[in-house]
């Protein structure tokens, strides 16, 4: 009986072993059905996918264990992972580009509207108040506003010279209008300017407008220029191609888990960060100059307020013009007597009317309108958005990992570490190119920075210097900082024939501008300002010097 029971037990055990041998899934290659489904959903041919796992000696990127990926599949997925990251990078920067473009349009529209409203107010009020003093010289006022628009728009105009010429020519025109019966040749008008200088025929208006307009207009146009340059930098950097080493690392990060039969495993957080910190190391080097630019832009908005701020001055040019004509009417008799005393009696114009023009004595008192609050709202929104964007470049790897690459929420045994499901142990690298020398995931040659990004770093430096100069009221006579003409001083920029050269101005004659005729601008100042404008800083030599200093003397890392 005991022997029979033992025999039955042996038969049962043998049957169980046979059944297990026949039915154990682990004893056979695993199916690639899930990988086939994912691969086909990406538009690839299912004929490339094996039915079951195969040996992985052919793999060049993924670990060479049993795999569901052929060589062709690995290559296709590597190309797809690179394209997906480049698309994610473009999408990740698109919102910032849109924000900067919207800010640029908003501020540009506002400043243009202020200037247009000022000219409209002048055209409505001056004819009734000043009569022919204005109507016969209306073109001079239109030309002034046209040149102010060009200056704001980025044209290489010298604003002080522009204003100096305006006042000098206006004085000549009005003096001719006062004495139509006299012949007034150019040499007599030169003498007129010298005699008029100590008399300040226009009162303090020319000096006040010169001081305030220089600060206000340069602040406004430099700020709008800065928004354009920032947007250009983001746009160009977003298009910088990924390196081959980065492409390999991204393939391993995103799709090698599929090839190894664990498509549900998401990348470990620190693993993803190391891959993207290596891929975007050059982009992270923008951080310091990017912060400097945005800080300078936030700071210069302080120059938009107060009596000398852009809001008051750009929208109030006509107030100073009205004050000037009021003063000239008060000083006309004294001016005429002093000019004749100092320059002599001019010859009589045989074709003149024979009598002096009777000056109208109307005065124009304009009430300043309080700001509508539009600029305050624009500045408030811009400050918040610029501050939010300060850490954009160094936060980009983490943002892409969490929003675009389906990173795991925790680093544990269930996440993909590049080799298998399990914890990721290496430490996270720092930001920037120099910190990638020991990156375990991406081979980065820290001695070869990306030249496109280095050029954009230089553009940020140049623009920051202009903003700092504008904050101190200095016009650095800049041209467009970007190399393709976008991001110019206003949203529309300025015409090609105007930007990048001195804008020619038509005058009553071809002689030297009467800068010495202006109150508050001495003859020596006039000679200085009428000299050739300094050439704007060129990026090329500075860039070479900057790169020579910036490149770390570290040998390429071996693998």
From Swiss-Prot:
Protein task: Cell surface proteoglycan that bears heparan sulfate. Binds, via the heparan sulfate side chains, alpha-4 (V) collagen and participates in Schwann cell myelination. May act as a catalyst in increasing the rate of conversion of prion protein PRPN (C) to PRNP (Sc) via associating (via the heparan sulfate side chains) with both forms of PRPN, targeting them to lipid rafts and facilitating their interaction. Required for proper skeletal muscle differentiation by sequestering FGF2 in lipid rafts preventing its binding to receptors (FGFRs) and inhibiting the FGF-mediated signaling.
Family: Belongs to the glypican family.
Protein origin, superkingdom: Eukaryota
Disulfides per UniProt: 32-68, 62-256, 69-259, 191-343, 246-279, 268-415, 272-401
Keyword Cell membrane: yes
Keyword Chaperone: no
Protein name in UniProt: Glypican-1
Molecular function in Gene Ontology: copper ion binding; fibroblast growth factor binding; laminin binding
Covalent lipidation (GPI-anchor amidated serine), chain numbering: 530
Coiled-coil regions, chain positions: none
Species of provenance: Bos taurus
UniProt modification remark: S-nitrosylated in a Cu(2+)-dependent manner. Nitric acid (NO) is released from the nitrosylated cysteines by ascorbate or by some other reducing agent, in a Cu(2+) or Zn(2+) dependent manner. This free nitric oxide is then capable of cleaving the heparan sulfate side chains. N- and O-glycosylated. N-glycosylation is mainly of the complex type containing sialic acid. O-glycosylated with heparan sulfate. The heparan sulfate chains can be cleaved either by the action of heparanase or, degraded by a deaminative process that uses nitric oxide (NO) released from the S-nitrosylated cysteines. This process is triggered by ascorbate, or by some other reducing agent, in a Cu(2+)- or Zn(2+) dependent manner. Cu(2+) ions are provided by ceruloproteins such as APP, PRNP or CP which associate with GCP1 in intracellular compartments or lipid rafts.
Annotated region described as Disordered, given as residue ranges: 478-539
């Amino acid at each position: 009986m005991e022997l029979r029971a033992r025999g039955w037990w042996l038969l049962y055990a043998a049957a169980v072993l046979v059944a297990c041998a026949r039915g154990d899934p682990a004893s056979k290659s695993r199916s690639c059905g899930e990988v086939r489904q994912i691969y086909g959903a990406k538009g690839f041919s299912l004929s490339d996918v094996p039915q079951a796992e195969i040996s992985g000696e052919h793999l060049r990127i993924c670990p060479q264990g049993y795999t569901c990926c052929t060589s062709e599949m690995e290559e296709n997925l590597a190309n797809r992972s690179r394209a997906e990251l480049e698309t994610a990078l473009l999408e990740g920067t698109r919102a910032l580009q849109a924000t900067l473009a919207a800010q640029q349009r908003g501020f540009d529209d506002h400043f243009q509207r202020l200037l247009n409203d000022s000219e409209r107010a002048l055209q409505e009020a001056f004819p009734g108040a000043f009569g022919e003093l204005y109507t016969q010289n209306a073109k001079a006022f239109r030309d002034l506003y046209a040149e102010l628009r060009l200056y704001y728009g980025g044209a290489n105009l010298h604003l002080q010279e522009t204003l100096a010429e305006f006042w000098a020519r206006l004085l000549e025109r009005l003096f001719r209008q006062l004495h139509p019966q006299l012949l007034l040749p150019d040499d007599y008008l030169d003498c007129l300017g010298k005699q008029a200088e100590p008399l300040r025929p226009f009162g303090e208006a020319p000096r006040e407008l010169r001081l305030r307009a220089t600060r206000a207009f340069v602040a406004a146009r430099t700020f709008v220029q800065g928004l354009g340059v920032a947007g250009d930098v983001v746009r160009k950097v977003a298009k910088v191609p990924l390196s081959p080493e980065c492409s390999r690392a991204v393939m391993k990060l995103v799709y090698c888990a599929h090839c190894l039969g664990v498509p549900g495993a998401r990348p470990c957080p620190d693993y993803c960060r190391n891959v993207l910190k290596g891929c975007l190391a050059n982009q992270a080097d923008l951080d310091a100059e990017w912060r400097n630019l945005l800080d300078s832009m936030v700071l210069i908005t302080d120059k938009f307020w107060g009596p000398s701020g852009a809001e008051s001055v750009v929208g109030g040019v006509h107030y100073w013009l009205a004050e000037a004509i009021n003063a000239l009417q008060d000083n006309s008799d004294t001016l005429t007597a002093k000019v004749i005393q100092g320059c002599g009696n001019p010859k009589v114009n045989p074709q003149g009317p024979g009598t002096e023009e009777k000056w109208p004595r109307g005065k124009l008192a304009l009430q300043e309108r309080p700001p509508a609050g539009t600029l305050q709202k624009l500045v408030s929104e811009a400050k918040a958005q610029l501050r939010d964007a300060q850490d954009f470049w160094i936060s980009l790897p983490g943002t892409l990992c969490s929003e675009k690459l389906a990173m795991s929420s925790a680093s544990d045994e269930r996440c993909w570490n590049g080799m298998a499901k399990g914890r990721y142990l290496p430490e996270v690298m720092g930001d920037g190119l120099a910190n990638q020398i020991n990156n375990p995931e991406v081979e980065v040659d820290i001695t070869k920075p990306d030249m496109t990004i280095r050029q954009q770093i230089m553009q940020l430096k140049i623009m920051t210097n202009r903003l700092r100069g504008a904050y101190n009221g200095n016009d650095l006579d800049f041209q467009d900082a970007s190399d393709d003409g976008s991001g110019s001083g206003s949203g529309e920029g300025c015409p090609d024939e105007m930007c990048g050269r001195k804008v020619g101005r038509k005058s009553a004659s071809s002689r030297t501008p009467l800068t010495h005729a202006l109150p508050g601008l001495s003859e020596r100042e006039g000679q200085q300002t009428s000299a050739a404008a300094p050439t704007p800083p060129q990026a090329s030599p500075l860039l070479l010097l900057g790169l020579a200093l910036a490149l770390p003397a570290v040998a390429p890392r071996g693998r």
